[in-house]
From Swiss-Prot:
It comes from Staphylococcus saprophyticus subsp. saprophyticus (strain ATCC 15305 / DSM 20229 / NCIMB 8711 / NCTC 7292 / S-41). K(+) binds at residues 231, 250, 252, 255. GO terms for molecular function: GTP binding; GTPase activity; metal ion binding. This is tRNA modification GTPase MnmE. Pfam families: MMR_HSR1, MnmE_helical, TrmE_N.
Length: 459
């Protein structure tokens, strides 16, 4: 594939130890050579070497910067094109000047994600691997980065390719049946093979979909809402979990008048913590807005932490809150265990039934470990770090897998009902195409452009 040569700054803008300008394309080395002065021309250096020299403005012959230049020849590069990386001192002025020179002498400013897009278009990675690159960049826990790295290395892709190959084998058998309809034994054998392999494919798709919830948590974070009536210790809990003081903690009920969000790594599980305003009837218009936002956050939550006060009796307000959350994934936290007891724990247990209950003192930082373990076990059922690393974490992949499961089931139902094989073939072919969309074998140009537009510039 013959593409023009692109350039961009690949390091964050601002002062820093180094800055990198990256070029990729057929003219990458030639353009860099026009700006570089060193011991030998970049055109003549060995691939995958770093070369010391200077960037010169050819028009004025002025030395712009002292640099180290990496030359990487196709096809053994990320994009499978020639790549040049100019390493200079960090700083906005110099790196921008080098970037401008590369564009003056023939390169085009890269679009967001264009390097990764070229890696996909040139066959180095498939679409699911390309999407995993962004997941890796955005990872908020070690676990999430390992899951993304497994996908970059092709673990999910290999699974999808195996299922597509199995479908092709079924389709080949179906073709024999269509070509020789007069042989009953061929039809019987075809139906037997089709049902056996199709059910195996459906089982494998279901296994992948079973990881979807956990995978999305790894990718996007577990949306966790802390809820309770005012002044039960919700903000103190947030602060203990994030070990920060973003949420204001006072003795005045209703201090948190908005939803506050923080990401935190809880035993390998990324939590997107949302501390809400206390949900209660209020005449304060500002607090009322916060209460409405709290209700909205509750409706979107993956997990709810329902906080009660050990120092107060159970109230109608507590019961109303429980009614709102009783059908959700929730953990009940009895806080302020360091104070005098006024809460009847048996009454609480009767109300919440099988819902997990943890006793804490946020002031003395007691019970935090038990809470973290309960959160982990509720969604991952044990040690997150020691579980298998293959998850489906992307909403697009999950949607396509569900479609593929439906169409393979249609093929199974049709075969069992004695529908003609050429009709069954349609469902099988559609399943093969849907699975291909996951890895980009049958994705539209519009979808590809949309996915890569979400990447950062320089990646």
């Amino acid at each position: 594939m013959d593409l023009d040569t692109i350039t961009s700054i690949s390091t964050p803008m601002g002062e820093g130890a180094i800055g990198i300008v990256r070029l990729s394309g057929v003219d990458a080395v030639d353009i860099a050579d026009k700006l570089y002065k060193g011991k030998e021309r970049l055109e003549d250096v060995t691939s995958h070497t770093i070369n010391y020299g200077h960037i010169i403005d050819p028009e004025s012959n002025e030395v712009v910067e002292e640099v180290m230049v990496s030359v990487l020849r196709a096809p053994k590069t990320f994009t499978r094109e020639d790549i040049v990386e100019i390493n200079c001192h960090g700083g906005i002025l110099t790196i921008n000047r080098i970037l401008e020179l590369t564009m003056t002498y023939g390169a085009r400013m890269a679009d967001p994600g264009e390097y990764t897009k070229r890696a996909f278009l040139n066959g180095r990675i498939d679409l699911s691997q390309a999407e995993a690159v962004m997941d890796f960049i955005r990872s908020k826990t070690d676990r999430a980065s390992k899951v993304a790295m497994n996908q970059i290395e092709g673990r999910l892709s290999d699974m999808i390719k195996r299922q597509r190959q199995s479908i092709l084998e079924i389709l080949a058998q179906v073709e024999v049946n269509i070509d020789y309809p007069e042989y009953d034994d061929v039809e019987d054998a075809t139906t037997e093979v089709l049902l056996g392999k199709s059910n195996e494919i459906k089982t494998e798709i279901n296994k992948l979909l079973d990881t979807g919830t956990q995978g999305k948590i790894m990718r996007e974070g577990l949306s966790t809402v802390i809820v309770g009536k005012p002044n039960v210790g919700k903000s103190s809990m947030l602060n203990n979990l994030i070990q920060d003081n973003k949420a204001i903690v006072t003795e005045v009920p209703g201090t948190t008048r908005d939803t506050l969000e923080e990401y935190v790594n809880v035993r390998g599980v990324p939590l997107r913590l949302v501390d809400t305003a206390g949900i209660r009837d209020t005449e304060d218009i500002v607090e009322r807005i916060g209460v409405e936002r709290s209700r909205k956050a509750l409706g979107e939550a993956d997990l709810i932490l329902f906080v009660l006060n050990y120092n107060e009796r159970l109230t109608d307000e507590d019961r109303k809150l429980y009614e709102v959350i009783k059908n959700e994934d929730a953990i009940v936290i009895v806080n302020k265990m360091d104070l005098d007891k006024h809460l009847d724990l048996d009454e609480v247990k009767d109300m919440i039934g099988d819902m997990p209950l943890i006793q804490t003192s946020m002031l003395k930082q007691e019970g935090i470990d038990q809470l973290e373990i309960q959160i982990r076990d509720l969604f991952f059922g044990g040690d997150v770090q020691n579980q298998d690393m293959t998850y489906v974490s992307n909403s697009r992949h999950i949607s396509l897998l569900k479609q593929a499961r439906n169409t393979i089931q249609d093929a199974i139902d049709a075969a069992e009902s004695g529908v003609p094989m050429d009709m069954v073939q349609i469902d099988l072919t559609r399943t093969w195409e849907i699975l291909g969309e996951i890895i980009g074998e049958s994705a539209s140009d519009e979808l590809i452009d949309q996915l890569f537009s979400q990447f950062c510039l320089g990646k």
